[in-house]
C-alpha cells in the first residue's frame, strides 16, 4: 500500500483445532505462533437495501428495513431450513451438483444468489457461476466438518501470527540447500 509492503496470504488463511489437528501439530512442533481469527460472512447487494452479516440478529438485520422485506425474510427462513436439513444421509442422488440441488429444493432466489453461492465463492475463491457446479456431496461434507451449518457453538478459527511468511521462512531455514537443487 503506497510504498509500504503488506504481506498477503493466498493459500489457506484460517484453520481450527477440530478439523486441522495435523496442521496444529505441525505448527506446535515448529514453534509457529498462531492467533484467534474471525471467520465471518457478510453480503451487500449493490443498489439495494439488501445486506446482512452473520453476527447474530443485529447483524442479520443490520439494515432494519429488511425486517419488512418479504424476500429477505424468506431468505433467512431458507437459511435456517437449509442448514437444519443439510445432511448427507438425506441425499439420494450422490452425483447431483449444489446448483441443481438448490433448484430441486425450491429455495428462494435470494438464498441462492445472496447467501449460499457467495459463501461458496468466498470459501473456495471461485466465481459464482462455478460454485453451483460443485458436487453437493463435497459441499455438504465440508460444511458439516467445519461446523458451518451450526448457528451456535461454531469452532474458533485461528490464523498464523504474522501470516504464512512466518512459517514458510521457519521451515525453509530448517531445510538444507541440497533439497532445492
Which residues make up each language-model segment?
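Helical element adjacent to the flavin cofactor pocket in flavoenzyme catalytic cores
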Residues: 140-181
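Glycine-rich FAD pyrophosphate-binding loop
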Residues: 1-2
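Mobile amphipathic helical/loop "lid" adjacent to a hydrophobic cofactor/ligand pocket
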Residues: 5-9, 16-141, 145
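A short acidic, glycine-rich active-site loop
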Residues: 10-14, 157-158
